[in-house]
Amino acid sequence: MVTEKVSLTEEEENILKESVGKKMLLVTSADDSNFSTDFNWTIYFSFEKFYIKIEREDIVAKFFDAFEDGGRPKVERISRDEIKKTSTKTINRIVKDVDLISVTAEFSNYKITCPKAIVFKFDDCNLVIEKFWLFSLAGFKIFLNSADNENFGLTDELQFWYNAESNSKKPIITQEIKAL
């Protein structure tokens, strides 16, 4: 069996940890779908004094060909000028913690462990950046999640973008977050 492990670098993990205790102001996507699809390939996070970019970086599984690639989150600290605004949502919440959730998938004689989601935790909800299909050309789905109701804690007041009614399949990561 071919075994592969893909993970964030120590530098990338440190960038994410730097956000703990800081106020996240905005989340911005370079995609023009207003966060309604899983084709968000580049996501920007604006904090009071710094900026982070999470981008889908291609990984080609040894077992698959180039057309069935996956994508891992690549995390970078950037300048404000590098943000390409298309869709923006206001967050205005202090990050209490950041979790990186990895999964292991097996296909025939191939096994890979790779990042599945990055979760920014706030007092009242979680902001989830999830790669739904490990080996697809899609990017990340971004949504708010909270254990307090069936609609992932979303309210009109928050004006967020994940609509449970339009998607009969709940995000895979939802149950894992509720269990934390």
What are these regions (language model features)?
Residues 1-180:
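Surface-exposed, interaction-prone regions used to assemble/regulate multi-protein complexes
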